[in-house]
Amino acid sequence: TNPEWVIDTNVLISAALSARGAPGRLVQLVLERSALVFSQPTFDELKTRLYRPKFDPYISLELREAVLHDLSAAARWVEIGEPSRYCRDRNDDMFIETALAAQVGVLVSGDQDLLQAPAIPGLRILNPQQALAEALA
C-alpha cells in the first residue's frame, strides 16, 4: 500500500456525501492507514466546490466545515508552483503537480482527462475502484 495519496476534488466530495461507495471507503482507509496530500490550490478547489449550493440537500454546512477541518488537519501539505501542462483541462494539472511535488506514486481521480493523461514517469493515475482494491490489498 502507498503511504500517501493525492485524491482529486470530485472523489473527496463523493466521499463526503456518502461513506458507502468506493470513494468514501478509500478516503476512510487513507485517513486510517496512511496520509492524504494537499497543496493550497487543490485544497482551495475542494473548499470552493464543497460549498456549492447544489450540495445543500445532501450535506450540512457544519458537516462541510468538519470534513474540511479533518482533511486539512490529517494532510501533508506541499508547495507547488505554476503547474506544467499535462491535461486537456488545465484545472487538473495541479493534482499531477501536487503528486509529483509530494513524490507519491498514485493520484486518484474519476476525471477522464486525468485518467487519460499521457504517462508521467513515477506516477500512476487510478480511478477510485482501482485505488480501493490496491489500498485493501
Task: Annotate each predicted stretch with a short phrase.
Residues 8-9, 39, 110-111, 128:
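A secondary-structure boundary/capping signal
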Residues 13-15, 55-57, 82-88:
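Short, flexible loop segments at the rims of nucleotide/cofactor-binding pockets, characterized by
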Residues 15-16, 49, 58, 117, ...:
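Residues that scaffold the ATP/ADP-binding catalytic core of kinase and kinase-like folds
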Residues 1-38:
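Short, well-structured N-terminal submotif of metal-dependent ribonuclease cores
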Residues 100-106, 112-137:
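Acidic, PIN/NYN-like endoribonuclease modules and their adjacent C-terminal/linker elements
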Residues 72-106, 112:
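Active-site neighborhoods of divalent-metal-dependent phosphate/nucleic-acid chemistry enzymes
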Residues 28-82:
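PIN-domain endoribonuclease scaffold, especially VapC-family toxins
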Residues 21, 37, 59-62, 86-91, ...:
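Residues at secondary-structure transition points
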